[in-house]
């Protein structure tokens, strides 16, 4: 009788373990399924940098809205491929003044372009002064502000205010004509 009770108890325990293992396997399958990235974006939010210093001056800054991201384009009168972009405080070039108090947005991208915003005679090539807003971003889903931080010793700085810390990418495009562009895209969400 004792053996029969022990075997019955063992059978109940084993049945419970087998049932639990089946549920765990099903739960594991459910947990392994992840949502696909927003618009296929896999950029991340880590710092990005590339290229070398150039003497081709910055001549234009413009923005654009796309379905999955907002864009800032920096155009140069010649070949430029140097930049460093990352989240954090941005300082004016040559003065060291923090731009965060003057830049709208929940997060701040510091953009350092490895090219001047002045020509060979040291005359400014963009219409902005240090601290001025370079774009009207009304109705942009992600971008909140683009503030010129100045140009000093061949480097030009911008503070780009965004809604939150979001994935971004930076790349270089040739043209039009002999110009080049550094492009910054910031996703609308993760």
Residue ranges and their predicted role:
Residues 27-190:
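Short linear recognition/processing motifs and adjacent strand/loop elements at protein termini
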